Regions:
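Long, C-terminal-biased catalytic regions of enzyme "large/alpha" subunits
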Residues: 1-178
């Protein structure tokens, strides 16, 4: 992967001229990731999913562990990018202070300078209670009429407000237990 990114970086610099420059970043914004996958399919490319993500790994792959994700978003690779290299570290639940400290050390060691921890939150559609855990029932009123908050491209948003393709993608995401 580093070889490919290095090649892209080389040609971006080589063909840069006044009024024309090229950029390489991981940024399929909410609708762009869906549109690019659709356009690639229409152009005959093999597209395994309906939505591209801004990561160097498949978000639903349970075999890519948290430490590897920090490596993949570390200096070795992002030094070839000109922007948009955020890691959304999807976790099943909040960590202890010591566990967060350990991951911050990993991020520093790997040179992963742009990341956030992403833990789904539960929103009760009946009483409005928000819980910082992924729950099946509201702890305040007992309702099962729930929605969830997670990151779509960097900010927390109700999953029900994602585009349809992003809702499908969000349902496939793997949230690691640390």
């Amino acid at each position: 992967m580093e070889e490919i990114l290095s090649l892209i970086e080389k040609y971006n610099k080589q063909y840069k001229k006044p009024g024309l420059m090229f950029n390489c970043e991981m940024i399929p914004a909410e609708n762009v990731g869906v549109k690019h996958a659709k356009w690639d399919k229409e152009d005959g490319f093999k597209v395994p999913r309906d939505c591209y993500n801004s990561y160097f790994y498949v978000v639903e792959n349970q075999n890519t562990n948290v430490l590897d994700k920090f490596k993949l978003h570390g200096e070795r690779y992002i030094k070839h990018l000109t922007g948009g290299s955020a890691l959304h570290c999807n976790l099943e639940e909040h960590l202890t202070q010591d566990q967060y400290r350990q991951l911050l050390k990993v991020a520093s060691k790997e040179g992963c300078n742009y990341f956030t921890f992403n833990i789904p939150n539960t929103v009760c559609n009946d009483c409005g209670h928000i819980d910082k855990r992924y729950l099946k029932k509201c702890p305040k009123c007992g309702s099962e009429n729930l929605d969830y908050l997670t990151r779509v491209i960097g900010y927390m948003k109700r999953v029900s407000n994602f585009s349809q393709a992003r809702q499908v993608e969000a349902s496939k995401r793997f949230y690691a237990k640390f």
